[in-house]
Structure formats: structure tokens, C-alpha cells
Regions:
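His-Asp-centered metal-binding catalytic motifs of divalent-metal-dependent phosphohydrolases/nucleases
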Residues: 58-76, 81, 85, 108-115, ...
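An active-site-proximal "capping" alpha-helix that borders the catalytic cofactor pocket
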Residues: 43-47, 80-96
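Divalent metal-dependent phosphate-bond-processing catalytic cores, especially two-metal-ion Mg2+/Mn2+ enzymes
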Residues: 1-14, 18, 28-56, 67, ...
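Short, well-structured alpha-helical segments
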Residues: 37, 41, 62, 101-112
């Protein structure tokens, strides 16, 4: 069960408290684990920072940040969770959010392949992947700039700040 005392994120067109609550309810694992709400909030913080700096679609990035791990079945190896998240996102378009075909294609790609280690793609997809990878400190891994996609995420200041948030489990 989610600790309701957690601070809520800054809202936007996409990030509403109702949508965050929905994502939390859809997630079937413990939110105190490695892939729960606190992780999503750090990824959201990273994603917003990167999207602004890199000129990526904030709408797609915010959706990715909230949806990317909602379909996990376990905390360990779950190679299909990204594909399940992408399919799930398709079912929610027009219900919880509205994105056009181009935005949906970017979101689908970002969700489907976010755990596969790719570094090439549209800048919005790259921002999504880096937002998640910058939070690897939570599992004892310091992100390597060679495995990141964007210039902003590779900068020592951004990389170090994200790593400190992740190892100290600061929600955002």
C-alpha cells in the first residue's frame, strides 16, 4: 500500500493527482520497492529537467515517467514490462490523457524499450530513457555517461545530482 503521507508532485496537464493515484492503484507491487512511486517521482523530476533542457515533448516524457514501471510483475527480471506498459498506455489514451498519433508512437517506443539499453532515437525517447537511467543509484549502480543518451544527462552536475537523489532515496 502506498504511504499517503508522500508529497504529491507538481501538477501539469498530464500529471494530475487523479492520474498519479490511478497509476499507483494499477501498480500491483509494493511501492516501497525499487520500482514504485518514489522511483517514479525521481524519474519525473529527471524527465522534466531533461525535457526542458533538450527540447523534448514534456507531455510524452511525463506520461513515460508515470507509466514506465506500472506493469511490472516483479522487482527483478521482467523483460516484457516495458512492452506491457506500452500496450497499457494505448488503452488509456482518450481516457486519462490525450495524445496524437505521433506522440503515442514516441511514448510506445520509449516504454517498450526503456530497459533494453538503447541510446539512439528521437530526442523525446532519449530523454525518457535517461530520466529512468539517472535513477539507477537506487539499485547500487552509478549511471555511466556512455550508457546515457543526452548531452544534459551526461553533464557531471546533472549526473551527480540525480545519483545523490537516487542513493539517498529522495522522492524528488
Amino acid at each position: 500500500m502506498l504511504n499517503k503521507s508522500l508529497l504529491t508532485p507538481t501538477t501539469s496537464e498530464i500529471v494530475t493527482q487523479a492520474f498519479v493515484n490511478f497509476c499507483c492503484e494499477v501498480y500491483k507491487m509494493n511501492h516501497d520497492g525499487f520500482h514504485g512511486y518514489k522511483h517514479w517521482m525521481r524519474v519525473l523530476h529527471n524527465g522534466r529537467l531533461l525535457a526542458k533542457a533538450e527540447g523534448a515533448s514534456m507531455k510524452v516524457v511525463e506520461l513515460f515517467c508515470l507509466l514506465h514501471d506500472t506493469q511490472r510483475k516483479n522487482e527483478n527480471v521482467d523483460p516484457e514490462h516495458g512492452h506491457r506498459a506500452a500496450e497499457f498506455a494505448c488503452t488509456q489514451n482518450g481516457i486519462w490523457f490525450d495524445v496524437n498519433n505521433d506522440e503515442m508512437q514516441l511514448l510506445y517506443e520509449a516504454l517498450s524499450y526503456h530497459s533494453d539499453g538503447y541510446t539512439e532515437g528521437d530526442i523525446t525517447v532519449q530523454v525518457c530513457w535517461d530520466a529512468d537511467r539517472l535513477d539507477l543509484g537506487r539499485v547500487g549502480i552509478k549511471p555511466s555517461p556512455s550508457r546515457l543518451c543526452t548531452i544534459t544527462s551526461k553533464s557531471p552536475a546533472v549526473l551527480d545530482a540525480a545519483y545523490q537523489r537516487s542513493v539517498n532515496f529522495i522522492p524528488y
